[in-house]
């Protein structure tokens, strides 16, 4: 039995990985899908208050500690690669494997926005300058349409996702991550989503550098033929890959 902790991406919540968690549990594993502060059902916690990357790292470390989890396969999807990495660094003794699911691979001293295409990086920095550190950035409609195009899934599924999307605490995008040598003791793997689509709309692919680094560093590397959000398009497939990597 493996214990999985899956960290969701920007604008989402633990809810979006629940189907994958159910599949993992059906195979006899434990699975946790925590929601980061200010997102999903915890959206209300960021109203009027800045929420940075450090808080999101605290969220994941708290799950590991309070649930008394050890030998964990910690998975960071998209933006979730940032807090997952920070948590693996702080709680390296609890993490067996750190898996990036088309996730951001951070560089110590830099922030998520440093990895973003210029159009979105500028939008976030300008919004924070105008509205202050508690500003929450809405998901651009064009980005949602590129991530889950009309007709790619049943319309009811697409509407349900859109209904649960929440504005993301912008400060978490701009707060730099600071890593220690502890992270080097944690094995890492990368799952690349190859069916593209959103990068053209975004003006660049923010996870491409991490995927290239994974190959250069000799991490275990796998691919899945889905767009950027595999939990939407192939929950069974991404669950199988996670189990394969855990073994």
Task: List where the protein language model places each region.
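Flexible "cap/lid" loop of the alpha/beta hydrolase fold
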Residues: 89, 95, 99-141, 206
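Conserved loop-alpha-helix segment in the C-terminal half of the alpha/beta-hydrolase fold
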Residues: 195-234, 241-245
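Gly/Ala-rich beta-loop-alpha elbow adjacent to hydrolase catalytic centers
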Residues: 75-80, 84
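Conserved HGGG/HGGXW glycine-rich cap/lid loop of the alpha/beta-hydrolase fold
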Residues: 2-43, 65
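Active-site nucleophile elbow and catalytic-triad environment of alpha/beta-hydrolase enzymes
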Residues: 163-182, 205
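Catalytic His-Asp charge-relay segment
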Residues: 185-193, 220-221
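Active-site loop/oxyanion-hole signature of alpha/beta-hydrolase fold enzymes
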Residues: 30-32, 36-73, 89-90, 112-117
